[in-house]
């Protein structure tokens, strides 16, 4: 499949292409969806490990005394009780409970010991 040259490329694009990644247009990004067969890749992940290039995803930082309260209103999972370095899967929903996006939220401290959350969004 020939992809438009105008597609965004992650820092790992050349590696994916050189290693046989079948590249597709994913929301304006050239990303691999498959390398070998679906069954081979499924078995590899189930029996060993797998990684994904998520460098195209957005990262939002939330800090300050109201960060946990704000995220409690935005997300379907609690964040106030997270341990340092912990990551949780959560959802952002609309007023009717429909899913807008699935996200990862992490809890960290900066070099001065100040806490902050990082939200990784699609």
Model-predicted regions and their roles:
Residues 1-122:
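Basic, glycine/lysine-rich polyanion-binding surfaces/domains
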């Amino acid at each position: 499949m020939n992809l438009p040259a105008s597609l965004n490329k992650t820092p790992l694009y050349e590696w994916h292409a050189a290693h046989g990644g079948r590249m597709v247009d994913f929301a304006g990004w050239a990303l691999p969806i498959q390398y070998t067969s679906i069954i081979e890749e499924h078995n590899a992940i189930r029996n060993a490990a797998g990684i994904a290039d998520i460098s195209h995803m957005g990262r939002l930082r939330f800090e300050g005394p109201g960060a946990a309260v704000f995220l409690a209103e935005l997300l379907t999972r609690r964040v106030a009780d997270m341990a340092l370095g912990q990551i949780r899967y959560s959802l952002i929903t609309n007023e009717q409970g429909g899913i807008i996006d699935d996200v990862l939220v992490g809890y960290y401290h900066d070099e001065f010991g100040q806490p902050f959350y990082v939200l990784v969004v699609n």
